[in-house]
């Protein structure tokens, strides 16, 4: 695998961020464990605390070992794939747009219902990923969300809200 | 022979029109989704889980078995025609398979993969019929300390043995274990890591974790690096094999099956090692060594058979001990739990009809796959041309639907996104995802078994060491941990003879 152009210059320093994430998670887990009441009984001599404490310590230790590995020039290989072009830098705009539409779906699914929120999600994601056929995208989005609603919510009894379209669908 | 009569009962259960229809839908849906670029078997299974929700367990698992084998087959089609495997287990198939496709022998590559999968899958499922009850008999006698030890071994195996980087694998495992910790402690009722959010009291559903890490994480990762040029897809006709292809394929199929099953069945196995071993073996045994590196059919037949056989093998620990060793098995375990069914030694006693119908439907799924996919291969290949913006939008769409449908809570969608971002980060920094999933699923059970063991010993740590089984397992664990040191001992560092 060829190295990414942006990374050839030196170590992949962003990995220290991962160390920080692991260490912070470890600290958070330990703090949370110390917060909970320590209950033990003859049925359960060790209680709910030791496991999170052990995990927290293990996370801290792993963070340190990982940092040493990074300092020595260790790096994880980014995942390749059929549609992945690792020579390009991360396309932040696309990712942020996707996150936005994803959250919109989470916010809209109960008030508006799956048919509308799901269609927004599909249309928006396709748009974020570079779809410029807006009408075609909308038609596919509508067909997918209506189709899944009828097949799953009505056909199979899966939990999908009808929202404002209650009574119409 | 008791097993065979159980199995026949299982077949008798399948042969109803509705169940056959389920198997057919499963195979078709599994292949159609699995063949899509960027979607490996584990993601296929996670994404298609919702279609089993409204069904009764038996039908759901018949459908599921079809999805599983369909997803596996679809994945190998993608790797042969595109040469960029979605899963590490298809890496080897892709090497010679894609070379064959480029040399104009795509039809033969797909045919030997399909027939090889059928042969190996059938043999391995047959082996499963005989091996699983033996493992069950063994597992019935195990106590909590033994289970605890087995789970520790599984943790180490998935995080340290299978990956390329120990520290990254271990970090991934720990993050998974922490996610598994979230929720009310089952023994004392104390809330852990719930941040006071009531919805988190039940923990994060494993389906949400799997869909978030596999599907959303993958979609975001691909979106960040989307290849703007379209990928060249090799056109393919109807798969077929000439007499000579048959002659060259059947031995690799059998050898692949023999290699794959045992590796799949042990906790530290996985599919990568047997596929590589099979490739190496075929390269050595072939009468056409000059073709290796240019598209040798043995190099597709063997590894693909090994891959399928190990997939069937991985169902042995999953069903008999409740121990998932692959991502697909982990998702399957989650599916069992969503029906309130606990895999493990008691499963065969409590739900014999379900288990044997599931096993019978593995045979059926395998057969349907062969019958359907040989003629349909050109149609599947067309799916590879699906515009990428619709493909990944569709993945996000179905991922959201599936995750929401589990509990009908909008918060799950937010969690799904957070897990997706975690999956994105793991792909960016080269962290393996399997340890995380296994940690989420097995973490709570390991804690439960560990605490039970200590309950018996009144809190003395000696309670964790039960009997001969756990001694043996801890010895294996010690070996795994010390291996980097042991390897430097003089006995292992003899100069290697050229292979």
Report residues per predicted region.
Chain B
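Membrane-embedded alpha-helical modules
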Residues: 111-227, 338-489
């Amino acid at each position: 695998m060829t190295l990414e152009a942006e990374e050839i210059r030196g170590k992949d320093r962003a990995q220290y961020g991962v160390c920080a994430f692991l260490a912070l998670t470890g600290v958070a887990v330990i703090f949370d464990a110390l917060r909970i009441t320590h209950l033990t009984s003859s049925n359960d001599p060790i209680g709910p605390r030791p496991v999170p404490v052990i995990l927290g310590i293990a996370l801290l230790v792993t963070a340190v070992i990982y940092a040493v590995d990074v300092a020595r020039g260790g790096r994880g290989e980014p995942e390749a794939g059929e549609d992945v072009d690792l020579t390009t830098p991360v396309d932040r705009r696309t990712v942020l747009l996707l996150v936005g539409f994803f959250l919109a779906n989470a916010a809209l699914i109960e008030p508006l219902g799956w048919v509308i929120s799901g269609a927004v999600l599909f249309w928006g994601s396709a748009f974020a990923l570079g779809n410029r056929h807006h009408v075609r995208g909308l038609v596919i989005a509508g067909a997918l969300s209506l189709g899944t609603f009828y097949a799953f919510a009505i056909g199979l009894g899966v939990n999908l809200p009808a929202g404002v379209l209650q009574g119409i669908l | 022979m008791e097993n065979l009569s159980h199995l026949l009962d299982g077949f008798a259960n399948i042969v109803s029109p509705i169940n056959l229809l389920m198997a057919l839908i499963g195979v078709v849906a599994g292949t159609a989704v699995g063949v899509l670029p960027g979607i490996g078997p584990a993601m296929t299974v996670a994404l298609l889980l919702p279609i089993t929700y409204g069904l009764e367990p038996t039908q759901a698992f018949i459908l599921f078995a079809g999805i599983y084998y369909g997803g596996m087959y679809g994945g190998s089609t993608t790797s042969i025609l595109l040469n960029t495997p979605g899963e590490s287990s298809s890496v080897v198939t892709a090497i010679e398979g894609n070379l064959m496709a480029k040399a104009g022998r795509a039809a033969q590559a797909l045919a030997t993969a399909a027939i090889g999968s059928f042969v190996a899958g059938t043999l391995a499922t047959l082996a499963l019929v005989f091996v699983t009850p033996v493992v069950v008999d063994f597992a019935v006698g195990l106590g909590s300390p033994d289970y605890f030890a087995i789970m520790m071994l599984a943790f180490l195996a998935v995080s340290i043995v299978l990956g390329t980087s120990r520290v990254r694998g271990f970090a991934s495992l720990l993050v998974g274990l922490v996610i598994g910790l979230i929720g009310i402690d089952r023994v004392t009722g104390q809330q852990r890591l719930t941040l006071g959010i009531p919805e988190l009291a039940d923990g994060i559903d494993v389906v949400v974790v799997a869909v978030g890490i596999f599907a959303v994480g993958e979609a975001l990762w691909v979106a960040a690096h989307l290849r703007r040029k379209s990928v060249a897809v090799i056109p393919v006709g109807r798969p077929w094999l000439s007499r000579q292809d048959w002659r060259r394929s059947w031995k690799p199929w059998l050898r692949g099956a023999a290699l794959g099953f045992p590796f799949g069945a042990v906790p530290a196995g996985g599919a990568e090692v047997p596929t590589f071993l099979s490739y190496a073996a075929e390269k050595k045994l072939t009468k056409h060594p000059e073709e290796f590196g240019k598209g040798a059919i043995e190099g597709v037949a063997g590894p693909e058979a090994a891959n399928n056989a190990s997939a069937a093998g991985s169902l042995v620990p999953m069903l008999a001990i409740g121990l998932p060793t692959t991502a697909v098995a982990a998702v399957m375990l989650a599916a069992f739990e969503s029906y309130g069914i606990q895999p493990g030694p008691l499963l065969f006693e409590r739900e014999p009809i379900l288990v044997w119908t599931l096993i019978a439907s593995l045979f059926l799924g395998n057969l349907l796959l062969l019958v359907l996919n040989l003629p349909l291969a050109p149609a599947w290949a067309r799916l590879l041309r699906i515009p990428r913006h619709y493909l990944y939008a569709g993945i996000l769409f179905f991922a959201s639907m599936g995750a929401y449908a589990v509990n009908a809570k909008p918060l799950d969608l937010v969690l799904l996104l957070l897990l997706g971002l975690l999956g994105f980060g793991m792909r960016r920094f080269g962290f393996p995802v399997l340890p995380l999933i296994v940690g989420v699923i097995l973490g709570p059970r390991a804690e439960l078994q560990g605490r039970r063991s200590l309950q018996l010993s009144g809190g003395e740590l000696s309670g964790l060491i039960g009997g001969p089984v756990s001694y043996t397992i801890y010895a294996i664990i010690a070996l795994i941990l010390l291996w980097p040191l042991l390897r430097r001992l003089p006995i292992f560092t003899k100069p290697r003879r050229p292979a």
